């Protein structure tokens, strides 16, 4: 008989559910990015929509997702189950895809985007909570990293698939959108057969995520973060405008998804070093560098001529995303009292979600009225104001 008394402890492995959730995220991202990589040009070229309408559609869609996130985690805790909301969220995402292929007007595209983003907002919080539910605390970092890595694979694969499908289907964007149904339904089937419908009881009774009475307990430092987040969001309008700019500078329709490929490649390569920079020197440095990168990106996109300048600007846009994504959420967590953290995130997501709508609408109107340079000049101006506020206020530890 073997003596195992002194054997080293067995290292915990990432649960099967986390792998399934990662694959679900990957397939849905492939489905969504196939559509998103071409949608701005489908609206303007095929449907003859104004750029202002593109901004309105994207702004409403993204703000809807942000606002839905405020309440989805609470509902998940309230009903005591994660799977129903996860399934509903991914189901709405998959069901929206046929509407893009059938759309004969901007109104139907608007409805499809609204349904798709409601689904994204509903599934995000319960999905992340389920990862925590099934994973031992000592490997949760690895578990979240795995899910995010598979999600990133989808963000690359979707635009690349769109390029291949455009060549195969002779630039028929409706046919490409129809193909996006396949990975979307694959994601839904994986949720149905691969995720257990286990109950999840929080340690304390779930609280409404946004309570007016809690706002009095949030101090000036927190509201400064909200103000900076709002100003930063005004500078961060939809990536649809990057696709439109590249097309205006001569990028062929079939290669339009290359914009998101380049942006996501730079973003993914820079995210880990940016995290190391934040760990080593605090959150302020990467935020300032990210804002400087965004200003430089806007300068290239607003004043540069030709595709080389445009793609350099797109790469800088990816740099700013790598440096800034997650930093503001970190600041919200730091500046809000622990007992009010849920309400603090609710306020922040609500404020930035509504601001995203205003930012994208303004960007679209400026594009139609004064041309692409005005859109990117305005974005650069908001980024410069945000950089000034960060550099001169004691909001973020240096």
Predicted features, each with a name:
Residues 2-16, 197-228:
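Juxtamembrane intracellular "pre-TM" segments in multi-pass secondary transporters
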Residues 91-104, 292-305:
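C-terminal ends and interior cores of transmembrane alpha-helices
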Residues 174-192, 374-391:
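Symmetry-related core transmembrane helices of the 12-TM Major Facilitator Superfamily/SLC fold
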Residues 8-62, 222-259:
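Helix-loop boundary and gating motifs at the non-cytosolic
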Residues 78-90, 280-291:
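Cytoplasmic membrane-interface "Motif A"-like loop-to-helix N-cap segments
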Residues 112-153:
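Cytoplasmic helix-loop-helix junction between adjacent transmembrane helices
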Residues 41-46, 157-177, 358-374:
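Transmembrane alpha-helix termini and helix-breaking/packing motifs in multi-pass membrane transporters
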Residues 68-80, 166, 270-282, 367:
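Helix-to-loop junctions at the C-terminal end of transmembrane segments
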């Amino acid at each position: 008989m073997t003596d195992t008394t002194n054997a080293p402890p067995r290292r915990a492995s990432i649960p099967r559910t986390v792998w399934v959730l990662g694959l679900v995220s990957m397939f849905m991202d492939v489905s969504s990015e196939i559509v998103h990589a071409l949608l701005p040009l489908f609206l303007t070229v095929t449907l003859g929509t104004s750029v202002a309408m593109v901004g309105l559609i994207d702004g409403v869609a993204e703000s809807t997702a942000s606002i839905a996130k405020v309440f989805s985690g609470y509902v998940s805790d309230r009903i005591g189950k994660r799977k129903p909301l996860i399934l509903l969220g991914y189901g709405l995402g998959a069901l929206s895809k046929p509407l893009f292929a059938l759309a004969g007007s901007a109104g139907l595209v608007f409805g499809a985007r609204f349904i798709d983003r409601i689904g994204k907002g509903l599934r995000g919080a319960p999905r992340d909570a389920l990862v925590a539910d099934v994973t031992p605390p000592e490997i949760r970092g690895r578990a979240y990293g795995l899910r995010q890595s598979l999600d990133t694979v989808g963000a690359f694969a979707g635009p690349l698939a769109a390029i291949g499908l455009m060549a195969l289907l002779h630039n028929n964007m409706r046919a490409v959108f129809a193909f996006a149904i396949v990975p979307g339904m694959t994601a839904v089937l994986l949720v149905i057969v691969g995720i257990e419908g286990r109950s999840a009881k929080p340690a304390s009774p779930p609280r409404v995520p946004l309570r007016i009475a809690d706002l009095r307990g949030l101090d000036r430092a927190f509201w400064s973060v909200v103000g900076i987040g709002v100003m930063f969001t005004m500078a961060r309008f939809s990536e649809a405008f990057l696709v439109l700019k590249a097309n205006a500078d001569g990028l062929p329709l079939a290669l339009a998804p290359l914009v998101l490929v380049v942006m996501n490649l730079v973003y993914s390569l820079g995210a880990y070093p940016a995290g190391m920079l934040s760990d080593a020197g605090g959150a302020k440095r990467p935020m300032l560098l990210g804002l400087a990168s965004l200003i430089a990106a806007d300068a290239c996109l607003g004043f540069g001529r030709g595709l080389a300048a445009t793609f350099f600007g797109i790469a800088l846009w990816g740099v700013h995303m790598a440096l800034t994504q997650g930093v503001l959420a970190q600041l919200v967590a730091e500046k809000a009292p622990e007992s009010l953290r849920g309400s603090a995130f609710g306020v922040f997501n609500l404020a930035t979600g509504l601001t995203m709508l205003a930012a994208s609408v303004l960007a679209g109107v400026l594009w139609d009225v004064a041309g692409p340079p005005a859109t990117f000049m305005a974005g650069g101006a908001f980024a410069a104001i945000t950089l000034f506020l960060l550099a001169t206020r004691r909001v973020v530890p240096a």
